[in-house]
């Protein structure tokens, strides 16, 4: 689905289903440098099980026109604009990494629009290392390698992919190589600079990978302490890329959390 926001095209994957009034809505928000396809497996399930689905391409990513938005708050406001444009009063937000910060900020500042949030591979604060930021700033391909290697558990390149025919490293690199120069750096800086404003009152689910070296489970401890009550799922086998590394466990956690 393409919509027009501020004279720019924005794309949302809807699992090949038209949006229907009366159905609950779930919005999937990708991480830094990625696009809607990060949530391909999970979003498709909900689209075929009674939900309106919007798996978004943020501005400057995938099929949405740029430039990228420079702050998490601006991205959260943009997500709410999408809801406005589509006459969706309230939605569940599911975010991965940077997307989890967007969901978090939207829930804090636009509480009346957010029913629940699921935070996949979240850390707070989400400080990005200077070598990673610097490589992205220089549009150095080393930044893509850091994103890809740190973004998956160490066993991923050894095989055993739960999705037959999918090469996780290659898939990640292909998405990053499609980016315009500066987009990855903009995303990383926005994530690193983010400070939560306000409190979150809606139900919250944390889905964390035990083998995640980018946002290890302990890095969500401060945030979990600020949000009570919340639910927690830790996937022992997964690194940062939970949706691809552990698609079934991630989906099971979401299904249980979104059960109506």
Question: Where are these predicted regions, by residue range?
Answer:
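Active-site loop/oxyanion-hole signature of alpha/beta-hydrolase fold enzymes
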Residues: 6-11, 15, 40-48, 52-98, ...
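Alpha/beta-hydrolase fold catalytic core
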Residues: 1-26, 48-51, 88-89, 178, ...
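Flexible "cap/lid" loop of the alpha/beta hydrolase fold
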Residues: 101-145
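Active-site glycine-rich loops that stabilize anionic/oxyanionic intermediates
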Residues: 31-34, 97
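The conserved beta1-alpha1 loop
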Residues: 29-31, 208
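Conserved alpha/beta-hydrolase catalytic His-Asp/Glu region
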Residues: 134-199
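Catalytic histidine-centered segment of alpha/beta-hydrolase-like enzymes
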Residues: 238-251
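Conserved serine/cysteine hydrolase catalytic core
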Residues: 181-225, 234
């Amino acid at each position: 689905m393409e919509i027009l926001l501020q004279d720019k095209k924005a794309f949302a994957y809807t699992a090949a289903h038209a949006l229907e009034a009366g159905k609950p809505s779930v919005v999937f928000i990708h991480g830094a440098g990625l696009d809607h396809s990060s949530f391909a497996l999970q979003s498709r399930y909900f689209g075929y099980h009674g939900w309106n689905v919007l798996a978004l391409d943020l501005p400057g990513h995938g099929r949405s026109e740029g430039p990228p938005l420079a702050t998490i708050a601006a991205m959260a406001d943009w997500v709410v604009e999408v809801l406005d444009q589509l006459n969706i009063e309230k939605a569940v937000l599911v975010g991965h990494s940077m997307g989890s910060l967007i969901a978090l900020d939207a829930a804090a500042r636009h509480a009346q629009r957010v029913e629940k949030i699921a935070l996949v591979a979240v850390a707070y604060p989400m400080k990005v290392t200077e070598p990673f930021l610097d490589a992205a700033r220089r549009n150095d391909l080393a930044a893509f390698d850091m994103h890809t290697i740190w973004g998956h558990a160490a066993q991923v390149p050894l095989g055993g992919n739960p999705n037959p025919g999918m090469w996780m490293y290659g898939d990640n690199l292909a998405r990053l190589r499609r980016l315009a120069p500066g987009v990855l750096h903009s995303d990383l800086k926005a994530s690193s600079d983010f400070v939560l404003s306000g409190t979150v009152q809606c139900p919250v689910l944390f889905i964390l990978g035990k083998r995640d070296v980018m946002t290890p489970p302990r890095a969500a401890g401060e945030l979990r302490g600020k949000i009570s009550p919340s639910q927690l799922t830790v996937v022992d086998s997964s690194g940062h890329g939970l949706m691809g590394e552990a698609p079934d466990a991630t989906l099971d956690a979401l299904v249980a959390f979104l059960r109506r």
